[in-house]
Amino acid sequence: MPQLNPAPWFMIMLMTWFTYSLLIQPKLLSFTSMNTPSNKTTSTTKPTPWTWPWT
């Protein structure tokens, strides 16, 4: 079964991924984030307990 022999296609797959990552990575890193992170602390609210009708 030729599918079990990784020699013919494994290097092609690796080179394709390396090529795509080298071409796409600069494009993705050039995007700027529109929402700047803030130092605001998150406030947690305490939930009210559920009143069960049968208790």
Curated annotation (Swiss-Prot):
The chain crosses the membrane at residues 8-24. InterPro entries: ATP8_metazoa (IPR001421), ATPase_protein_8 (IPR050635). It comes from the Eukaryota. It is found in: Mitochondrion membrane. One of its GO terms (biological process) is proton motive force-driven ATP synthesis. GO terms for cellular component: mitochondrial membrane; proton-transporting ATP synthase complex. Keywords: ATP synthesis, CF(0), Hydrogen ion transport, Ion transport, Membrane, Mitochondrion, Transmembrane, Transmembrane helix, Transport. Component of the ATP synthase complex composed at least of ATP5F1A/subunit alpha, ATP5F1B/subunit beta, ATP5MC1/subunit c (homooctomer), MT-ATP6/subunit a, MT-ATP8/subunit 8, ATP5ME/subunit e, ATP5MF/subunit f, ATP5MG/subunit g, ATP5MK/subunit k, ATP5MJ/subunit j, ATP5F1C/subunit gamma, ATP5F1D/subunit delta, ATP5F1E/subunit epsilon, ATP5PF/subunit F6, ATP5PB/subunit b, ATP5PD/subunit d, ATP5PO/subunit OSCP. This is ATP synthase F(0) complex subunit 8. It comes from Coturnix japonica (Japanese quail). The lineage of its organism: Eukaryota, Metazoa, Chordata, Craniata, Vertebrata. The gene is MT-ATP8.
